[in-house]
A protein has these predicted regions:
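Short amphipathic alpha-helical interface segments
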Residues: 2-49, 97, 101-157
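Short, Lys/Arg-rich nucleic-acid/phosphate-binding segment
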Residues: 68-78, 179-187
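Non-catalytic, well-ordered alpha-helical scaffold segments
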Residues: 24-27, 52, 56, 91, ...
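Alpha-helical oligomerization segments
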Residues: 167, 171-203
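Short amphipathic alpha-helical interaction segments
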Residues: 45-67, 155-172
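Short, amphipathic alpha-helical interaction segments positioned at domain boundaries
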Residues: 78-119, 189-203
Length: 203
């Protein structure tokens, strides 16, 4: 019963962003992934067809990241395969977001960010939250270039070095470098975790 209730609460939280059927399936996937640090394809309690669709969505939304990668540790360099034995992990901030959702039935991105950054000075936490909220109005497809991020930080009165905020957010699973965009354009691009912005109050 407890497991069923947990899935129901997760599905309720996800329903603000996903259709009811997708929210239910994704809730089952997330619930399975929350039980251990890593999860294997065969541990996901879905039909093969649903598993394929949900894994694809989970990767696109950065809920689950394949352990297998090409060159760097960035999210976009990961290799998604659907074969048995493939291992996935959940970024730290996403794990905190969905652990809380499993208990409350709602998404609280600010609480997840504050929790994952709790070992940092209070000023950095406060300004990181402010920066992440403001960026939702400036990035495209949850991606932004470093110069834009610096301009946004300056424009919103953030005094903590934006490079320190970015470095901290990368370690916490809040952001990831975009290696392909950086290589092609000669600029530093970063991806923000999409699920944080499913919470409409995170702004």
């Amino acid at each position: 019963m407890q497991n069923k209730e947990t899935v129901t609460r997760l599905a309720n939280a996800l329903s603000t962003e996903l259709a009811a059927d997708d929210a239910q399936k994704m809730a089952e996937l997330i619930n399975a992934a929350l039980k251990s640090e890593n999860v294997y394809t065969e541990q996901l309690p879905l039909s093969e067809e649903d598993k394929h669709d949900c894994l694809l969505m989970a990767f696109e939304e950065r809920i689950l990241i394949p352990v297998r990668s090409t060159q760097t540790g960035s999210w976009e360099d990961r290799i998604l395969r659907f074969t048995p034995g493939e291992m996935f992990f959940m970024p730290h901030v996403a794990r905190l977001l969905f652990e809380n959702a499993a208990e409350t039935g709602t998404l609280d991105s600010e609480a997840a960010v504050r929790s994952v950054l709790s070992h940092h000075p209070e000023k950095q936490v406060e300004q990181s939250v402010k920066f992440l909220k403001e960026m939702r109005f400036h990035f495209r497809s949850c991606m932004a270039e470093g110069g834009l991020m610096s301009a946004v930080a300056q424009g919103t009165g953030i005094t903590v070095d934006v490079h320190d905020i970015v470095d901290t957010c990368v370690v916490a699973g809040i952001m990831s470098p975009c290696t392909r965009g950086s290589t092609m354009q000669g600029l530093a691009w970063y991806e923000f975790h999409p699920c944080l912005y499913w919470d409409q109050n995170f702004k």
